[in-house]
């Protein structure tokens, strides 16, 4: 292998440390939050700057996670090809990389995006993801992904903070909408993750990670998936007064679609049929993407909100 090939392999290893596919999903959540926060204004430059700062923060968290989980990754077939397991990058170099991304992400959001609050949210997210979720919850409780999933909800809060810190003085921040979007992802994370964990249950058991499918029956797991799916869909409805009919239609149609598939998985398990949990995992990704794209379109168009049409106070809607 020549020097160029070695350099490319090293770059690929560092990129893999950041879990780029996971980051894509996180960034998908940031865009609609920012568009909704500045409804109709569409400050594309600020959004792009925030996405880059958020990408660095998420990349730092994922890299720290790989360092902390390297012992587990060695035991799981799904993760044995990761860079640290294969010694493509040393733990020390990965840690330096993660710390560098952390500092740059914080300064980026503070200075270039003019939001120290967003920078602090990034630091809080990284701390929570590593020290609360990765080092404790993931290894100690079957509710690991329920509470640990809060870290994955933070991109909407980061994006909202950037917009509100750049709004004209006196403009209502409407943080309740950010909280709703936070809770949408919070409730969505368990069914999304448990569907994948059902597929790789033996892997998690071998690594000693008490994911719900490892410690509960498939019927109980899918029952919980249905309940969290219901909570996800109902939470999206809370935002209906703050958006137009476009969001309302997409929230209802995509929500029913997601719920029907979750119920179908549960009934298939309960009736002893052949089921494919990975289908729900993929569909859950598609559901969230469809919902957030719909919300983004609604916010970009900036049409009158349903709450405004009903004459409710503009302070909230």
From Swiss-Prot:
Its EC number is 2.5.1.141. It is a multi-pass membrane protein. Belongs to the UbiA prenyltransferase family. Protoheme IX farnesyltransferase subfamily. Carbon 2 of the heme B porphyrin ring is defined according to the Fischer nomenclature. The keyword Disulfide bond does not apply. Keywords: Cell membrane, Heme biosynthesis, Membrane, Transferase, Transmembrane, Transmembrane helix. It comes from Corynebacterium diphtheriae (strain ATCC 700971 / NCTC 13129 / Biotype gravis). It comes from the Bacteria. Converts heme B (protoheme IX) to heme O by substitution of the vinyl group on carbon 2 of heme B porphyrin ring with a hydroxyethyl farnesyl side group. It is found in: Cell membrane. Pathway: Porphyrin-containing compound metabolism; heme O biosynthesis; heme O from protoheme: step 1/1. This is Protoheme IX farnesyltransferase. PROSITE patterns: UBIA (PS00943). It catalyses: heme b + (2E,6E)-farnesyl diphosphate + H2O = Fe(II)-heme o + diphosphate. InterPro entries: Protohaem_IX_farnesylTrfase, UbiA_prenyltransferase, UbiA_prenylTrfase_CS, UbiA_sf. Signal peptide: none annotated. Pfam families: UbiA. Its main location: membrane.
């Amino acid at each position: 292998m020549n020097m160029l090939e070695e350099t490319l392999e090293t770059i690929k290893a560092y990129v893999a440390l950041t879990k780029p596919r996971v980051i894509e999903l996180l960034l998908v959540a940031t865009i609609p939050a920012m568009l909704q926060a500045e409804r109709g204004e569409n400050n594309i430059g600020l959004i792009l700057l925030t996405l880059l700062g958020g990408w660095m923060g998420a990349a730092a968290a994922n890299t720290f996670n790989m360092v902390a989980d390297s012992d587990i990754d060695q035991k799981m077939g799904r993760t044995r090809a990761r860079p640290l397991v294969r010694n493509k990058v040393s733990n020390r170099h990965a840690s330096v990389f993660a710390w560098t991304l952390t500092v740059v992400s914080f300064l980026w959001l503070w200075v270039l995006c003019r939001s120290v609050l967003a920078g602090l949210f990034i630091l809080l997210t990284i701390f929570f993801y590593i020290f609360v979720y990765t080092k404790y919850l993931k290894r100690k409780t079957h509710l690991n992904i329920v509470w640990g999933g809060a870290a994955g909800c933070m991109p909407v809060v980061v994006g909202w903070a950037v917009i509100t810190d750049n709004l004209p003085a006196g403009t209502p921040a409407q943080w309740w909408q950010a909280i709703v979007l936070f809770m949408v992802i919070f409730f969505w994370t368990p069914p999304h993750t448990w569907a994948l964990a059902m597929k790789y249950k033996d892997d998690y058991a071998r690594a000693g990670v008490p994911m719900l499918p490892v410690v509960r029956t498939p019927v109980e797991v899918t029952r919980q998936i249905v309940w969290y799916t219901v909570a996800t869909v109902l939470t999206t409805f809370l935002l209906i007064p703050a958006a137009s009919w476009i969001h309302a239609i997409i929230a209802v149609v995509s929500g029913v679609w997601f719920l029907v598939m979750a119920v179908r998985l549960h009934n298939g398990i309960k009736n002893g049929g052949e089921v494919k949990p990975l289908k729900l995992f993929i569909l859950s990704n598609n559901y969230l993407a469809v919902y957030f794209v719909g919300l983004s379109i609604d916010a970009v168009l900036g049409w009158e909100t349903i709450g405004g049409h009903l004459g409710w106070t503009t302070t909230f809607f």
